[in-house]
């Protein structure tokens, strides 16, 4: 963080992107400005955004690779220059772009001699490779080479203690951090009591999203963190009152699910996707992260299951219920899902 004195003027608080460039397929850069801020506010915003950008942005990466007839990760395979460990390290570096949630399967199946790159990965339709030229392995002989892969969207650095399994499946210490680096600097402007601060924010990403997209997602995450305090203030209620207000369950899950399955309307619950329910993007993303994709998946969960979902709030329960009330037949809700 750098602090400098510059000349400036007082205006309504605003932000804009002052520089944006693509250095390579896996390196995007953006520079943003926020001003004018009162003394001390730039540090507050800068620290919060930097931490949110580095730790809260989700990324998609390869988390597991399965080799056939390989005893351990330090093995070498005849006809391949790289060892298994080197191939795993190369797979770890592959940058993917996707909005998928849950685990997806991918694979590599080629015949040598061939220089294998990220372009040779067979991916599900929802996943895209950022840089198809990223190296994986070099086959020097006419051999068949196949790997089964698992892909997952997550955040932060994920590591597993168990490094190898008897079936040839090896976990990859996934780095789900699309933001490579963040730097901010503060400039003071004005004189005397009219002094204000200008915040400059620099963001570098790996190409799976732009710095502007990363800044938007980080800002939304920070807003979501403070929303409960805002609601408590507006409604004039304490946390204990909020807790008591949400104590009655919004679903009698298993019982209601059974009733729904038996209802005369014959609603195909497994064919109604949560994307069709007009949930907010935040609530829908929370559910998808927990592999809840259909109405059947949702109603199969208990209240405790939902509250264990990362970032799922008590307010989300009410929002889900209001949405179900809107989209399902009114008589069905009254007769089968009443509480």
Swiss-Prot record:
Residues 264-339 are annotated as: Alpha C-terminal domain (alpha-CTD). Gene3D superfamilies: 5' to 3' exonuclease, C-terminal subdomain, DNA-directed RNA polymerase, insert domain, RNA polymerase, RBP11-like subunit. It comes from the Eukaryota. GO terms for cellular component: chloroplast; DNA-directed RNA polymerase complex; mitochondrion. Residues 1-233 are annotated as: Alpha N-terminal domain (alpha-NTD). Its EC number is 2.7.7.6. InterPro entries: DNA-dir_RNA_pol_insert, DNA-dir_RNA_pol_RpoA/D/Rpb3, DNA-dir_RpoA, RBP11-like, RNAP_asu_C, RNApol_insert_sf. GO terms for molecular function: DNA binding; DNA-directed RNA polymerase activity; protein dimerization activity. It catalyses: RNA(n) + a ribonucleoside 5'-triphosphate = RNA(n+1) + diphosphate. DNA-dependent RNA polymerase catalyzes the transcription of DNA into RNA using the four ribonucleoside triphosphates as substrates. This is DNA-directed RNA polymerase subunit alpha. The lineage of its organism: Eukaryota, Viridiplantae, Streptophyta, Embryophyta, Tracheophyta. The gene is rpoA.
